[in-house]
UniProtKB/Swiss-Prot annotation:
Residues 692-863 are annotated as: ODD. One of its GO terms (biological process) is regulation of cell migration. Ubiquitously expressed in the embryo. Residues 381-422 form the PAC domain. Residues 72-85, 439-459 have a biased composition (Basic and acidic residues). Functions as a transcriptional regulator of the adaptive response to hypoxia. Binds to core DNA sequence 5'-[AG]CGTG-3' within the hypoxia response element (HRE) of target gene promoters. Induction: By hypoxia. Gene3D superfamilies: PAS domain. This is Protein similar. The keyword DNA repair does not apply. It is found in: Cytoplasm; Nucleus.
C-alpha cells in the first residue's frame, strides 16, 4: 500500500511539473514570437526556443486542439457503434419477424437465438429438398382416386384435390395424432434441424429451445455412440448411393431404430423443472437416414415415449396381456388372458424363460432388445413370434420396462400386444408344444367320456362325505380358484351351463371331482383359440375400445355380482388379479349345488392396463402352495401359539410391503411367523395422531364394519356366518383400529376390546375354534396370495397412498370392499381418480422417469418400521428367554383363572363408561414411541383380563396403555368425557379408584392370594436358579435391587434437610431420551390399601383373611382424610400431568367408604399391567407428587414388596430376578395411603428434586400440620443414605443389594417399634452405591447402550438377597436384558422430574417450548390442588412436593445443561427436532394436548434407518 501511494504521489508531482513546463513554454513562445517577429524565419529556425523541440506547436494553442480532436474521434466512434447496433437490431427484428414463430415466442429471444433459429429455418428448407414434393404426392393421390372412381368403388371421404387441406391446421393436428410422438430431424453432425411442437408434451422442452441445438446436449452420454452410428453411413452404402443413377433426382433411405434417453423436465405431476435437474426418459426413435446424391444425409425420425406400465390409463384390449419377468426374463407373473390367446395358464409359464416361448428365428433380435432394456430401463421389441401352447404362434410386440427398488432393478414388466391370430396351429415348433398337444388330446377324450355319463341326482350322504374329503384335500378347490380366467375360454353362457352340469354330477370320490374340475378349463382348446381369434377380429373392427370383460359382461351379466358390472379403473386387475373368495365358504360350495360360487371366483377380474402385475402377485407361490396345502394343520397350529403372521393374506388392515423379495418356496402366513412377546413396541398409540394429522379419511375407515369379516370372533363360529356377523357387533364402531381382524389366521389379532363381554366372546372363539378356522381358512388364504399384501414395492411408487394413508380401502381389495373404484388403486392420471390420496402421494413421492424410483421415505411404512405397523405385526421384539418365563407364568395364572369367573359381572357394569371413552385416547396418544402393549394382549392375557375384570378393567384407552406400558392389564380410567383432556384424565383416574375400591373383597382377596402363591412359587424357582447362576448375576442384582428399592425411599424415609446441589452432576448424564425411553410409560399408582407382609411360606389364602378386616377398618379411617387428594400421573418421558377433579374425588371416596363398610372385604393393591407393575426402567423414574396421610395402626405397615411380578409377560421392562419372575416391585403409584417401605435413603425423593436443606427448612413450617413422618431412625441413616443415593437414576442403573445393617423405615410412629416380618429377599434393606461418576460416565461399557439400534426398554436381571459385590461399575449383562432392535441410552439418573426433561434437551433440540411451559403447568396444577389435609405432614414432604411442582425450575436446570451434550451423539432421536420436542416437553393437557405438524411428523418418521 505504501509503495502504491508513493507512486501515485510521484505521478501527481510529475504531472504538475509537466503542466508548469507547458505553461512556461507557451509563455516563452509567445514572447519569442513577439520579439522575433521582425527577424527572418531562418533565424527563428536556426535558433529555436528551448521549448520548441518538445512541443512544435504555435502560440495559437495546438496542444488543446489535439485533445479536442481525440475527444471528437471518440465521440464519432461511439456514434458509429450506436448506429451499427441500431442497424443490427433492426435487422434482427426484421429477421425475427420473418421467422415462422409466434410473436410472443419471438419477443423472448435474444439475438443469438434468433440467428440460431434462422439458420435452423434455412436448414429446414434445405431438408425439404430431401423429401418428395407435396405436389408429387398429390398427383399420386389424384391418380389413385381416379382409378378408384373408374372401378366404381366408394369414393373416399377425404378429398385431396388441392394442397390447401394439407396445409391447414386440421391436417397438422391429425398428423400429430397419427405420429403418436414428435417429429425429429437430425443433421449428420447431430444438430437438431427440426422438431415438432408437440415435443413439449413428451419431454417438457420447447421447440424454440431445441431448434439448432445439438442432440448431444439433450441425450444421455451413454447413448451418444449409438446416435453417431445411426447418423453415420458406411462407405459402401454411400458409394452405392452415388453410383445409382436414379439417386440423382431422388432419395435413398436406410431404416433406423434406436432407443435414446433424452432429458425430460416433466414430473409425474405434470410440472416442469429446470433442465439442469431433469431426468432421462427413454424415447424410441424410428426413422430413416435420408441420403441424396451429394452424400448429404439427414435422419428423419419419430420419437415415441414408451409408456410406463403403471401409467397406462386406457383399458387394455382383449388382445393385449401383461407379463412380469425376473431380470433373467423368467416369468414371475402371467396374465390370465394368455389362456385365451395362446392357450397358456399361469402355471404353464411361471419360472420358465421368455426365450423358450418364442420362435428360434427371432432370438437374436429379442436378445439385443432386452440387453438394451436392462441397460436403459425401457425398450420395445420388434415383431416376434410367440409360440402357442398346443402349436402355432402369434405375432407379438412387447414393451418392456424395468421396475426399480431403491435404484436397483427388480423385475421387468412387459405389455404385450398380439398383432395377429394364431397362425399355423397344427405346426409344432418346440418340445413343449408337442407335450402339451399330446396331453390335450388325452384330456379331450376323457372329457368326452365324462359328458356321456348319465346325470344322477345328488345323494346327500355322498355330498357330506365329499365335503369332508374336500376339506381334507383342499388342493382341488384351490386349483380351481387358482385359474381365475380359465372359464373364459368358452362363451359365458355355455360356461355357466357346463359348470352346472358338472357340479350336479355326484362323483364317487373327491379325486374324480378334482379330475372333472381340471378337465373343465382344459376342454375344447380349439374352441378357445377360435373364440380368441373372434375377439381379436371383433376388437379390431369395434368402434370403441373394448374392456377386458366385455364378452363376459355381454354374455352373462346376470350372473355377475353388482360390483363386477361397474366400470373399473385401469390398474384394477393388477392389484386384484382375481376376486378373493369368501373367507369361510361352505366347503361344498364349489362342488355342489351352489353354482354361482363355482363361477364367480373364476370370472375375469376386469384387468386394465397393469393391474395384475403391479400387485406383484407372485404366481410362483401357487404351485408351492398347492403342495403345502396338503398339510395345513401343522403351520396353523404353530401360528395359534404366540405366533403372528407379519403379512395378512387378505390384504386387509395396515399390512405393509416387504422390501426384500419373497421366499417363494414357502407360504407367507405359515413361514413369516415370529415368536411373539405379549406387547407391541409401537402399535396403536398413534391412532389419534393419524386420525387428525395424516389420515385423509376417518380413522373408522379401518373399522371392521367395512369388511365382511368383523372384529368379532363370532364370525368364525360357523362357515355360514361370513356376512351376517357384522350387525351383531355392538362395539365394532368403537374398536376402530384395535379390533379390525388384520389377519384372520392370527388368534390374537384383536386388541383389547372396548366391550369386555364382546372381548371375552372373541377370545373364546379365537381359542376354541382355531382348528376349524385353520381348516377353513388355510386353502382360502392360499388363493388370496395374489392379493395386494404382496404388492410389489416397485409398482407401489405410483400408489403411495397405499402406504402413506392407513385406509384399508386403498389397499388391494378385500372381499367385500365398498366398490371396485374404492378397492382398486387409482391410476396416475385418470380423471376420476385424482383423489386426496393421489395428491398426497404425489407430494411425498415425485416420480419423473422410470429411472428415479421410490423416495427414501418408502421404507417408513414397511414391516420393519415400528411406527406404523398394525399391533399384530410387531409383537415380536422380545427374546425367547423372556417368553419362556412368561409361558411359565401364564400356566400359573391359568390354574387360578377358574376361581374368578364371578368377576365378569362387575365388568359389565363398567362397559358403558368405557364405551364412552373410546375416543379419549386420540388426544393423548401423541408420543410415537410409547408402548401400547395392552391393546394387543395374548389370548392368555385377554382371558386373564376378562376373569380379573374387577381388578383389571379392559378399557381400550390408549392413555392407560401408554402409562402402564403393560401387556395384559390396562389401567381403566373411567368417567364421563370432560371438556378438556385433563378433566377426562381426572375423571378416569377417579373412577378407576372408585372401581378399585368398589370391587368385592372376595375378588380382591382371592386375587391377592393368587399373587402370593405365584410369588412364592416364583421365589422357589428363582432360588434354584440363583444357586446355579449366582456368580453371573451378582452384578445384575446390584443394579436391579437398587432399581426396585430406590422408589421406596421416596415414601418411607423422613425427608432430611441434607440435600445438596452436587446431585445435579449425577442427573446430568442419565437421561438420554431415546426410543427405549419412550417405551417406558409407567403409571404410578399409589394405593390406599396395603397388605401385611406375609412370610414366604404363606401360600394359603387364610392369612390374608385375618388381616383383611383390620385393613378394612384402617382403610375406612384413612378415606375420610383422602377427599382432597391430588393424583398426578407422570409419564417417564412426556410427563403427562393430569389434575384431579376435587369434587368427583370426594364423591367417589365416599362411595368407596360406603361399599367397604357394606362388604367388609379386603381391598388389595391394584396391580397395573396385571400383577406386574410397570417396573422402573433404567432410563426413567417416575416423579411422584402426593400427600400421604399417616397410618394409625401397626398392621398398616404393608410392604410393597408383597406385590409379586407374576404377570410380567405383558410388561416390557421386567425387573427380573434370576428367572425374571417373582421379584417384588412396588406399585409405583399407590393411592394416597401410607406405605411401609424398606428404604434407606431419606433424601432420595428430595434429591430427585434437588432443593437446598435451607429451602427445605424454610418450607417446613408450611407443611407441619398436614402430615407426620417418623423421624426416629432418620438421624442414623441420613449420612449413610445421602452418600448411597446420589441419584435415583444412578440407582436404577447401578442397582444392587448389599447386606446392610440399616433398618427399614416405618412411616407410622406407632409402627416404628414393630419389627417388619422377614420376607427373605424381600425384606432386605436397600444398599445404594455412592460413586456415581464412575458408573454414570462409564456408559460405553454398558451393554444396554448399543448404538442406534431400536430397542425395547431393557429387561433387568433380578435383584436378589444374595447381595452384590459392591462394584459400582456393574451393569446388567443378562442376555434378555437387551432385547433385539432397541437402543438403550446411557442413563445415570433417569428422573422423570421436569428437571431432566427440560434441561436435558434444552441445548440439543431447537424446541420452541422451553422449561417454562412444563414448570408453570405443574406449578399451576399443584396450586390448584388443596395442599392441606386433615393429617399432619412433615416439613420435608411439603418441600418435596413443591420441588416436584416446581418442575425443576430451581437452580438445577441451568447447571445441568452443560454436561449433557455428550449424550446427544449416541441418541438417534436427538437428530429429529420433532421427536426432541416430543421427548423434551411436558404435555400441557389442559391446553388441548400435543399436536404434530405435518413437517414434524415427517421428521419424526425420518429418523435414521433402523437395522
Amino acid at each position: 500500500m505504501v509503495s502504491l501511494i508513493d507512486t501515485i504521489e510521484a505521478a501527481a508531482e510529475k504531472q504538475k511539473q509537466s503542466q508548469a513546463v507547458v505553461t512556461n513554454t507557451s509563455a516563452s513562445s509567445s514572447s519569442c514570437s513577439s520579439s522575433f517577429s521582425s527577424s527572418p524565419p531562418s533565424s527563428s529556425v536556426g535558433s529555436p526556443s528551448p521549448g520548441a523541440p518538445k512541443t512544435n506547436l504555435t502560440a495559437s494553442g495546438k496542444p488543446k486542439e489535439k485533445r479536442r480532436n481525440n475527444e471528437k474521434r471518440k465521440e464519432k466512434s461511439r456514434d458509429a457503434a450506436r448506429c451499427r447496433r441500431s442497424k443490427e437490431t433492426e435487422i434482427f427484428m426484421e429477421l425475427s419477424a420473418a421467422l415462422p414463430l409466434k410473436t410472443d415466442d419471438v419477443n423472448q429471444l435474444d439475438k443469438a437465438s434468433v440467428m440460431r433459429i434462422t439458420i435452423a429455418f434455412l436448414k429446414i428448407r434445405e431438408m425439404l429438398q430431401f423429401v418428395p414434393s407435396l405436389r408429387d404426392c398429390n398427383d399420386d393421390i389424384k391418380q389413385d382416386i381416379e382409378t378408384a372412381e373408374d372401378q366404381q368403388e366408394v369414393k373416399p371421404k377425404l378429398e385431396v384435390g388441392t394442397e390447401d387441406w394439407l396445409n391447414g391446421a386440421e391436417a397438422r393436428e391429425l398428423l400429430k395424432q397419427t405420429m403418436d410422438g414428435f417429429l425429429l430431424v437430425l443433421s449428420h453432425e447431430g444438430d437438431i434441424t427440426y422438431v415438432s411442437e408437440n415435443v413439449v408434451e413428451y419431454l417438457g422442452i420447447t421447440k424454440i429451445d431445441t431448434l439448432g441445438q445439438q442432440i448431444w446436449e439433450y441425450s444421455h452420454q451413454c447413448d451418444h455412440a449409438e446416435i453417431k452410428e445411426a447418423l453415420s453411413l458406411k462407405r459402401e452404402l454411400a458409394q452405392k448411393v452415388k453410383d445409382e443413377p436414379q439417386q440423382n433426382s431422388g432419395v435413398s433411405t436406410h431404416h433406423r431404430d434406436l432407443f435414446v434417453r433424452l432429458k425430460c423436465t416433466l414430473t409425474s405431476r405434470g410440472r416442469s423443472i429446470n433442465i439442469k435437474s431433469a431426468s432421462y426418459k427413454v424415447i424410441h426413435i424410428t426413422g430413416h437416414l435420408v441420403v441424396n446424391a451429394k452424400g448429404e444425409r439427414l435422419l428423419m425420425a419419430i420419437g415415441r415415449p414408451i409408456p410406463h406400465p403403471s401409467n397406462i390409463e386406457i383399458p387394455l384390449g382383449t388382445s393385449t396381456f401383461l407379463t412380469k419377468h425376473s431380470l433373467d426374463m423368467r416369468f414371475t407373473y402371467v396374465d390370465d388372458k394368455m389362456h385365451d390367446l395362446l392357450g397358456y395358464s399361469p402355471k404353464d409359464l411361471l419360472d420358465t424363460s421368455l426365450f423358450s416361448c418364442q420362435h428360434g428365428a427371432d432370438s437374436e433380435r429379442l436378445m439385443a432388445t432386452f440387453k438394451s432394456v436392462l441397460s436403459k430401463g425401457q425398450g420395445e421389441t420388434s415383431r416376434y413370434r410367440f409360440l402357442g401352447k398346443y402349436g402355432g404362434y402369434c405375432w407379438i410386440l412387447s414393451q418392456a420396462t424395468i421396475v426399480y427398488d431403491k435404484l436397483k432393478p427388480q423385475s421387468v414388466v412387459c405389455v404385450n400386444y398380439v398383432i395377429s391370430n394364431l397362425e399355423n396351429k397344427h405346426e409344432i415348433y418346440s418340445l413343449a408344444q408337442q407335450t402339451a398337444a399330446s396331453e390335450q388330446k388325452e384330456q379331450h377324450h376323457q372329457a368326452a367320456e365324462t359328458e356321456k355319463e348319465p346325470e344322477k341326482a345328488a345323494d346327500p350322504e355322498i355330498i357330506a362325505q365329499e365335503t369332508k374329503e374336500t376339506v381334507n384335500t383342499p388342493i382341488h378347490t384351490s386349483e380351481l380358484q387358482a385359474k381365475p380366467l380359465q372359464l373364459e375360454s368358452e362363451k359365458a353362457e355355455k360356461t355357466i351351463e357346463e359348470t352346472k352340469t358338472i357340479a350336479t354330477i355326484p362323483p364317487v370320490t373327491a379325486t374324480s371331482t378334482a379330475d372333472q374340475i381340471k378337465q373343465l378349463p382344459e376342454s375344447n382348446p380349439y374352441k378357445q383359440i377360435l373364440q380368441a381369434e373372434l375377439l381379436i377380429k371383433r376388437e379390431n373392427h369395434s368402434p370403441g375400445p373394448r374392456t377386458i370383460t366385455a364378452q363376459l359382461l355381454s354374455g352373462s351379466s346376470s350372473g355377475l355380482r353388482p360390483e363386477e358390472k361397474r366400470p373399473k379403473s385401469v390398474t384394477a386387475s393388477v392389484l386384484r388379479p382375481s376376486p378373493a373368495p369368501p373367507l369361510t365358504p361352505p366347503p361344498t360350495a364349489v362342488l355342489c349345488k351352489k353354482t354361482p360360487l363355482g363361477v364367480e371366483p373364476n370370472l375375469p377380474p376386469t384387468t386394465t392396463a397393469t393391474a395384475a402385475i403391479i400387485s406383484s402377485s407372485n404366481q410362483q407361490l401357487q404351485i408351492a402352495q398347492q403342495t403345502q396345502l396338503q398339510n395345513p394343520q401343522q403351520p396353523a397350529q404353530d401360528m395359534s401359539k404366540g405366533f403372528c403372521s407379519l403379512f395378512a393374506d387378505d390384504g386387509r388392515g395396515l399390512t405393509m410391503l416387504k422390501e426384500e423379495p419373497d421366499d417363494l418356496s414357502h407360504h407367507l402366513a405359515s413361514t413369516n411367523c415370529i415368536q411373539l412377546d405379549e406387547m407391541t413396541p409401537f402399535s396403536d398409540m398413534l391412532v389419534g395422531l393419524m386420525g387428525t394429522c395424516l389420515l385423509p379419511e376417518d380413522i373408522n375407515s379401518l373399522d371392521s364394519t367395512t369388511c365382511s369379516t368383523t372384529a368379532s370372533g363370532q364370525h368364525y363360529q360357523s362357515p355360514s356366518s361370513s356376512s351376517t356377523s357384522a350387525p351383531s357387533n355392538t362395539s365394532s364402531s368403537n374398536n376402530s383400529y384395535a379390533n379390525s381382524p388384520l389377519s384372520p389366521l392370527t388368534p390374537n389379532s384383536t386388541a383389547t376390546a372396548s366391550n369386555p363381554s364382546h372381548q371375552q366372546q372373541q377370545q373364546h372363539h379365537n381359542q376354541q375354534q382355531q382348528q376349524q378356522q385353520q381348516q377353513q381358512h388355510h386353502p382360502q388364504h392360499h388363493d388370496n396370495s395374489n392379493s395386494s399384501s404382496n404388492i410389489d414395492p416397485l409398482f407401489n411408487y405410483r400408489e403411495e397412498s397405499n402406504d402413506t394413508s392407513c385406509s384399508q380401502h386403498l389397499h388391494s381389495p378385500s372381499i367385500t370392499s365398498k366398490s371396485p373404484e374404492d378397492s382398486s388403486l387409482p391410476s396416475l392420471c385418470s380423471p376420476n381418480s385424482l383423489t386426496q390420496e393421489d395428491d398426497f402421494s404425489f407430494e411425498a413421492f415425485a416420480m419423473r422417469a422410470p429411472y428415479i424410483p421410490i423416495d427414501d421415505d418408502m421404507p417408513l411404512l414397511t414391516e420393519t418400521d415400528l411406527m406404523w405397523c398394525p399391533p399384530e405385526d410387531l409383537q415380536t421384539m422380545v427374546p425367547k428367554e423372556i417368553d419362556a418365563i412368561q409361558q411359565q407364568l401364564q400356566q400359573l395364572q391359568q390354574q387360578h383363572h377358574q376361581q374368578y369367573a364371578g368377576n365378569t359381572g362387575y365388568q359389565q357394569q363398567q362397559q358403558q363408561p368405557q364405551l364412552q371413552q373410546q375416543h379419549f385416547s386420540n388426544s393423548l396418544c401423541s408420543s410415537p414411541a410409547s408402548t401400547v402393549s395392552s391393546l394387543s394382549p395374548s389370548p392368555v392375557q385377554q382371558h386373564h383380563q376378562q376373569q380379573q375384570a374387577a381388578v383389571f378393567t379392559s378399557d381400550s384407552s390408549e392413555l392407560a396403555a401408554l402409562l402402564c406400558g403393560s401387556g395384559n392389564g390396562t389401567l381403566s380410567i373411567l368417567a364421563g368425557s370432560g371438556v378438556t383432556v385433563a378433566e377426562e384424565c381426572n375423571e378416569r383416574l377417579q373412577q378407576h379408584q372408585q372401581q378399585q375400591q368398589q370391587t368385592s373383597g372376595n375378588e380382591f382377596r382371592t386375587f391377592q392370594q393368587l399373587q402370593q402363591e405365584l410369588q412364592l412359587q416364583e421365589e422357589q424357582q428363582q432360588r434354584q436358579q440363583q444357586q446355579q447362576q449366582q456368580q453371573q448375576q451378582q452384578q445384575q442384582q446390584q443394579l436391579l435391587s437398587l432399581n426396585i428399592e430406590c422408589k421406596k425411599e421416596k415414601y418411607d424415609v423422613q425427608m432430611g434437610g441434607s440435600l445438596c446441589h452436587p446431585m445435579e452432576d449425577a442427573f446430568e448424564n442419565d437421561y438420554s431420551k431415546d426410543s427405549a425411553n419412550l417405551d417406558c410409560w409407567d403409571l404410578i399408582q399409589m394405593q390406599v390399601v396395603d397388605t401385611e407382609p406375609v412370610s414366604p411360606n404363606a401360600a394359603s389364602p387364610t392369612p390374608c383373611k385375618v388381616s383383611a378386616i383390620q385393613l378394612l377398618q384402617q382403610q375406612q379411617q384413612l378415606q375420610q382424610q383422602q377427599q382432597q387428594q391430588q393424583n398426578i400421573i407422570l409419564n417417564a418421558v412426556p410427563l403427562i400431568t393430569i389434575q384431579n377433579n376435587k369434587e368427583l374425588m370426594q364423591q367417589q371416596q365416599q362411595q368407596q367408604q360406603q361399599q367397604q363398610q357394606e362388604q367388609l372385604q379386603q381391598p388389595a393393591i391394584k396391580l397395573l399391567n396385571g400383577a406386574s407393575i410397570a417396573p422402573v426402567n433404567t432410563k426413567a423414574t417416575i416423579r411422584l407428587v402426593e400427600s400421604k396421610p399417616p397410618t394409625t395402626t401397626q398392621s398398616r405397615m404393608a410392604k410393597v414388596n408383597l406385590v409379586p411380578q407374576q404377570q410380567q409377560h405383558g410388561n416390557k421392562r421386567h425387573l427380573n430376578s434370576a428367572t425374571g419372575a417373582g421379584n417384588p416391585v412396588e406399585s409405583k403409584r399407590l393411592k394416597s395411603g401410607t406405605l411401609c417401605l424398606d428404604v434407606q435413603s431419606p433424601q432420595l425423593l428430595q434429591q430427585l428434586i434437588g432443593k437446598d436443606p435451607a429451602q427445605q427448612q424454610t418450607q417446613a413450617a408450611k407443611r407441619a400440620g398436614s402430615e407426620r413422618w417418623q423421624l426416629s431412625a432418620e438421624s442414623k441413616q441420613q449420612k449413610q443414605q445421602q452418600q448411597q443415593s446420589n441419584s435415583v437414576l444412578k440407582n436404577l442403573l447401578v442397582s444392587g443389594r448389599d447386606d446392610d445393617d440399616s433398618e427399614a423405615m416405618i412411616i407410622d410412629e406407632d409402627n416404628s417399634l414393630v419389627q417388619p416380618i422377614p420376607l427373605g429377599k424381600y425384606g432386605l434393606p436397600l444398599h445404594c452405591h455412592t460413586s456415581t461418576s464412575s458408573v454414570l460416565r462409564d456408559y460405553h461399557n454398558n451393554p444396554l447402550i448399543s448404538g442406534t439400534n431400536f430397542q425395547l426398554s431393557p429387561v433387568f436381571g433380578g435383584s436378589d438377597s444374595s447381595g452384590g459385590d459392591g462394584e459400582t461399575g456393574s451393569v446388567v449383562s443378562l442376555d434378555d436384558s437387551v432385547p433385539p432392535g432397541l437402543t438403550a441410552c446411557d442413563t445415570d439418573a433417569s428422573s422423570d422430574s421436569g428437571i431432566d426433561e427440560n434441561s436435558l434437551m434444552d441445548g440439543a433440540s431447537g424446541s420452541p417450548r422451553k422449561r417454562l411451559s412444563s414448570t408453570s403447568n405443574s406449578t399451576n396444577q399443584a396450586e390448584s390442588a388443596p395442599p392441606a389435609l386433615d393429617v399432619e405432614t412433615p416439613v420435608t414432604q411439603k418441600s418435596v412436593e413443591e420441588e416436584f411442582e416446581g418442575g425443576g425450575s430451581g437452580s438445577n436446570a441451568p447447571s445441568r445443561k452443560t454436561s449433557i451434550s455428550f449424550l446427544d451423539s449416541s441418541n438417534p432421536l436427538l437428530h429429529t427436532p420433532a421427536m426432541m420436542d416430543l421427548v423434551n416437553d411436558d404435555y400441557i393437557m389442559g391446553e388441548g394436548g400435543f399436536e404434530f405438524s405435518d413437517n414434524q411428523l415427517e421428521q419424526v418418521l425420518g429418523w435414521p434407518e433402523i437395522a
